[in-house]
Structure formats: C-alpha cells, structure tokens
Amino acid sequence: MPATRSEVIELLSAMVEIDSVTPWLIPDGAGEGRVAQYIADWLTAADIGAEIEIVEVEPGRPNLLARLRGTGGGPTLCVNAHTDTVGFANWPDTALVPRIDGDLMYGLGVADDKSGCAAGMLVLRSLASSGARLRGDLLVACVADEEGISIGSEHLARYPGIDAAIVIEPQPTDMLVVEHQGFGWIDVITHGVAAHGSAPEEGVDAIVHLAEVISRLHRLDREVFTRNPSAMNGRTVFHTGTVSGGTDYATYPNRATLGIEIGTQPGEHLNDRVAEIEAIFTEIAETEPGFRGEVSVRLDRDPFLAQGHERLQEALVASMTDVLGRPPTVTGLNAWTDAALMQAAGIPTLLIGANGGNFHAPDEWLSLSEFMKLCTILEQTAVSFLS
C-alpha cells in the first residue's frame, strides 16, 4: 500500500531530526550510526520480512542493507541512497527542525539524501504488503559517506550478486541520468625561496607565482571549458576552493598552495587535467625565473557512463512515463554521484530522484508530491524488473 502524505512527513521528519553529518567533512560530525539504526528499527517494526543488516564500513560508519527476497531465479536490484549530510554551521538553529510549507518540506538532508533512503524504505513496505510475487530480490542500501569520499558505496560495490542499481539523488523527477562528470580535488603548489623582505634579489615569491597560475587556470576555464560544453553534462567543472601561503609579512613566501575542484567528462581522466596544469607551469617558467610548480591529487573520481543498462532503462522509462504522463528526459549531470562507483564495479546503474533545492545550504527543501511520485516510480520499476 503506498504511503500517505502524513506517513511521508512523519518518516522524513524523524530522519531529518537525526544528526548524521559526515565526519569526513566535519571532524566532530555525528556520523551515520543513529540514522542507520533508526532505519533498521523502522523496517523491523514494519514487519515486512526484510533481511536487515548493519555493516560497519569503518568504526561508527555503517551501511544499512535491507533485502526483500523474491521467489528465486530473478535478478537483484539495488536502490542506493546515502544517510550522511554536510554540516550546518550556516543554519544551526533550524537545520534539524523539519518544517512544512505547502508542498515543500525543509530541513538538512530532507532532499540530499534522506529522501532517497525513505523512498527505498517505503517501497520495501509497499511491495511486501501488496503481496506481489517477484522472482528477484530488492536490496535497499542506505550508505555512509557520500558527502565525503564514498566509503559506503565503495564497500557496497563489492557486495556480491547485485545485478543492477538505481542511485537516488535529488534532481528533477522527470530526469533519468545516464552519465555525469568525474572530478578531482587537486592541490596546485608553487615553490619559492624564503628571504628577508628587504632582499628581493634573494627571494622568490611563491604567492606571486601562484597568482599567475590562478590567472591562467581561469583562462583555461573561460576559453576551453566554457566554450566546449558536453551536450549531456554541461561545461567541465572548475573552481578554486582554498588558498594558503607565506609565514609572515616580513618574509618572501617559499610556498603557496591552491586547492581546486576540476571536472572530467566521460572518456577523460584526471591525468588529462593534470597535464593541462603542468602545461601552464611550462608556459610560466619561460618568462618567470625561478618558477617551480607541482600538482598533488587529493581525490580522483572517474566520470559515470551507464553500460549494460538497457533492460533497467526500459523499465524505468515505462514507469516514469506512466507516473509523470510523459517520457523522462534522458540526460547527464555536471555533478558527481556514487553511481560512478557502482557502474565501475560492473553493475549497470542509472540515476533518478525527486525535486528539491538549496542543497548544502540553509533551507534545503523537498517537494512532497514529487517525492511520492518517485516512490511510485521505484515500486513500478521494481515490479517490472524483478518479475
């Protein structure tokens, strides 16, 4: 039986009220333990016969796995959503206080991505209560650390016997994502020579050299990335994130560091971006005596490109068309999701979600009516794919 609006609000409210900030981003973040236990308790109380397992990927960092077994002989479909959130320093008083205004529900993680976990939970309950006889298994995986370095989905991707996956992230409900960008977090470092501020003939200013690198990186963004966008994923992501350098006012800085996020399109690798940065170093060294630069990769995530997904896509398109009254828009994203990790493990994967907004910002919101459509789409897809 599909959930009512009041049941949806009750479930999402309870999940929003649980602090599950990823400690990878915020060192004293609460982590995912309490929300994973809440999901396990909710499913146990629902008495639907699901096999429930809490798997600690790292101490205090669990994945919650719930399997509704079919009659046998069918595939296993995994619904993947994440339990962790970013921090809420910008709205400490209201982030964990769910609020309803018409069709919109507000709160940290209500869209990104506790809505995905809740959708999986409600679909498990609905399928069990409907008495539908499915040959295959539905596995709902509420994973840790997507907002960090995705240790949860990296662990899940090694889980045996998953034949296809639907990753849920907030997005327009009529979007069916079949590819998206990868990204890298990179430190761009320039090295100078420390010297007394009154001895320019002895010092080499690492900050001045880094400023030249920044200028040329933005030129690369304007003249290459912006002018040559991907038809599916938009322009390649680039932005500066952090900058540091120097020791005091009176000394030439011997080191300066720029932290950037930079994207890759399907068919590209982060090594392509590193080569572009190193080419900038070569150009600068031709005119700046003493210039020395290096690149240090902090995190490298490959792009996502769905493969072997035709049967799953057929089921999703049929369900989305039925629920929405029109075919979905098959497209890409300029963001990154755990779909890339599932597909990289050889699991045919697609990405859907429900309308929301203000992700990683105050007053994050979710459309309740669109969320309920997502639940129906998931249930119909599971019935079709697993039968």
What are the language-model segments listed below?
Residues P2-A3, R34, E53, V178-E179, ...:
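Metal-dependent amide/peptide-bond hydrolase catalytic core
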Residues P2-L108, S129-L134, F385:
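Acidic/His- and Gly-rich active-site-bordering loop/insert found
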Residues N80-A81, A141-V143, I166-E169, I189-H191, ...:
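Short beta-strand segments
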Residues W91, D101-D103, V123-L139, L217-R227, ...:
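Phosphate-handling active-site elements
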Residues D103-A119, H196:
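Glycine/serine-rich anion-binding loops at beta->alpha junctions
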Residues D113-W185, L386-S387:
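Acidic/histidine-rich catalytic neighborhood of metal-dependent amide-processing enzymes
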